[in-house]
Amino acid sequence: MAKQNLELKATSFTLSVLHINHNDLDIIAAELDNKLAQAPQFFLGAPLVLNLSAIQHTHIDFNALKQLLIDRNLIIVGITDASAEQIEQAKSMAIAVVKSGKQARKAELPERATKIVKQNVRSGQQIYAQNADLIIFGAVGNGAEVIADGSIHIYGALRGKAMAGAAGDNQSVIIANSLEAELVSIAGQYWLTEHLQQYDLSQRGCVRLEGASLTVESLPQ
């Protein structure tokens, strides 16, 4: 059989979602610069989906916003939760319109699977549980990344990065025997090390999303 020179296949990727809560580009630029300064390598060249739910009824200059992000080595690949006018603007600029996790969950979904890892996750390694929860019987070291579309349970120390609800599920949680993490994220909302330091990181804890903010709850050992 002759080899096909072009194939179209379905797959999925983990994308960061940037929630735009104001239409003033100067305010957006200042807040974005502050976030980028906290973790410049993590966001370098990152493809972003813009969530516009907070500004659906206001005008925003997409050309200027796109350039603002390009100037910071960020790339808009799509928008979500947008108004009809915003959708038309995005389409005219060849920006995709994607369904948010909330929209996607309107259809009945099968029961979520569980991916189990029975070893430590070391620096440079990445584990992704697609359409699944992730359970790790071991530690997640500095420089390692664990990602799940569902929740993440770590029976060991979390010292690297953990990203739960990667497909937009804001009910996902991160549980670990200790939370000395470089980064924790749920449904695109993230905290870096300095945000976590207000808690007792040596204790078993649970990171969850309450509204639009992360919170940490201590758990019994």
Swiss-Prot record:
Protein name (record): Probable septum site-determining protein MinC
Organism: Shewanella frigidimarina (strain NCIMB 400)
Organism lineage string: Bacteria, Pseudomonadati, Pseudomonadota, Gammaproteobacteria, Alteromonadales
Alphabetical list of InterPro entries matching this protein: CAP/MinC_C (IPR016098), MinC (IPR013033), MinC_C_sf (IPR036145), MinC_N (IPR007874), Septum_form_inhib_MinC_C (IPR005526)
Keywords: Cell cycle, Cell division, Septation
Key word Cell division present: yes
Listed PANTHER family: SEPTUM SITE-DETERMINING PROTEIN MINC
Its biological purpose: Cell division inhibitor that blocks the formation of polar Z ring septums. Rapidly oscillates between the poles of the cell to destabilize FtsZ filaments that have formed before they mature into polar Z rings. Prevents FtsZ polymerization.
GO terms under biological process: cell morphogenesis; division septum assembly; regulation of cell division; regulation of cell septum assembly
